[in-house]
Amino acid sequence: MRKNLLDLILVVALFFMISGLHLAPGQELDDLLVIKKGQSRAVTSADPNPNSNADRIKIIAPGETKVLADIKGPGIVRHIWLTFNEARPNWLEPAGSARPDEIVLRMYWDDSLEPAVETPIGDFFGAGFGYRPELKSLPVQVESGDGYNCYWPMPFYKRALITVTNESPNKNVRSFYYHIDYTEEPELAQKTPYFCAQYRNEFPEKTGQDYLILEAEGGGHYVGTVMSVRSRSPFWFGEGDAKFYVDGEAKPTIQGTGT
């Protein structure tokens, strides 16, 4: 691929996990026929004062980190919803707010000091370059460009810590609302895998070299990639073949015909 074709590549590689992602029509409703042991819980930005409607984090200043959830396990995060003020100037922030690609989501499982998930919010939900498009898929949805939903199941044995950081150099995050649904579980099966998401970017892309999407160790399922590409050429950029190397292979087990 010629160097002058690509300006920037942003990738979120998602890997983990739990089999059974292929759901038959109506399967979700059939699940209601079985009483499960877990108990539904939620952590939200709701104001504890019932007479107030300030159900949000009002401001996240540049460089500031807020804890969205700190949950004792064992449990499974089932759904994350969030929304926040758009980046362009408006009555809330006349100078504009931080973009989705400047707001970083991190998730830590159990005793780990390193995040299993570390990615800009926009890219995690499938929207690269700070844009807020509408997106519909099984695991993530962006409604009307500003309501972010994630349905990936995220199990943890001891603790789940979810944070958000404003990495804009000079813009606030305004009116950050969130709702995190999870279940308290009596126990998790041994060797239940963790959900992980890895963010990478390259500017500019290097001529003649494969772009590394994911490098990971251990057992698990690779479940998908969000790739955002900005081209400096009007021509099609997607002729690079995707290649999968498993367990130290010298040649790829899977090689596609182009991205």
Residues covered by each model-derived region:
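Bacterial N-terminal signal peptides that target proteins for export
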Residues: 1-10
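Intrinsically disordered, low-complexity serine/threonine-rich segments
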Residues: 3, 18-22, 43
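Bacterial N-terminal signal peptides
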Residues: 9-20
